[in-house]
Each structure stands twice: as C-alpha cells, then as structure tokens.
C-alpha cells in the first residue's frame, strides 16, 4: 500500500466550502479510478487547513489511477471551484507502511466525538528497525488504543510529477484516535523521542470513512 498525506492551506473562511464539495464529488469518483480515500479532516488548530489521505495498491498503479481521475469528467467539472478555495497544495508526503499490517484502511469507526492525533517525526537518516523498536517500546504502550497507522517516507521517485510531493526528507507518521478532545488533552505525550515533529489534532469530516 502507498499513501499520500495531503495538507492544504486554504483561503480564509473557505474550508467548509471545499469540504462540502470534496465529500460530495471527490470520494466515489476517485475510488472508481482505483484510489482509496482513507480520510478527510479539519485541523482543530488551523481553520484554514484541510488534511486528507488517499491510498494506492502500489506505486505502479498510482500514475494510471491519478491520470484517470484528473482527466475525468468529475474533476474537469469541479476543479475550478475546488482550486478557488486553495492557497497551497504542495505539502504532500508519499508514504508506505513502516512494517507489515501498519498501513491505514478506511473501514475503522470510532465514537461520534472522535478526534485524531497525527504526528510526524523528521530526521536526517531513514527510520530503521532500531527506531521502530523504540517507538513500540516508548510510545505505543502509552496510547489509548493501537495506532491506526504507522507510515514512513516512500523514497521512490514521484511517478505523477504534475502533482508535486515533498522529497529529500525522512518522515515517520503515526495516527491515533481518541474518544474526544478531552481524552486527547489529558494524554501525556512521551518524551523519549527527541526529534523534530509536527502534531495535528484532527476531526473527521461528515464524509470521512475514517471516524
């Protein structure tokens, strides 16, 4: 499985407009092209950020699936409306599971008030078995439930260059679900991993299958 983590910066006040359009037009139409829409989210701490993930069976299947969607009728009919809400869509990571059975699937339901913590670690060298063992020892036991996904940079060349992705980076991403904002706020973050990181507190959109 190959995943894209996409963080969009939007024009002020236009996030709900894009979400309504996305949930209505861009889920089934992408999946008809062989793309798995894994989840769509609002960033609780940035009202102008929209975060979503999509998946592909493999790097080899990715270019055809994307070409079929972006040259297809649904994107052509709605691209101008979508693009009008966006300031920057270049913050995109190409990811793969860090170990067997750590990829993300959309068929995972939580509580109606679920909130997600998406954490990105960055370092100079690739994330290796020693790091993964340390994560399993220090972070995983402190989570309220098993991480929904643990992913890391896919270093293969971007084979759909008309959609840029971040390159030359080593990123490890994990996604966890909490019952509500209070549970997340009460959670004590382990400090054993002293790496540069980004944390996103996310709530699913109405159309997100990951909830």
Where are these regions (language model features)?
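Short S/T/G/P-rich N-terminal loop/turn motif that feeds into the first structured element of a domain
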Residues: 1-51, 55-76, 80-211
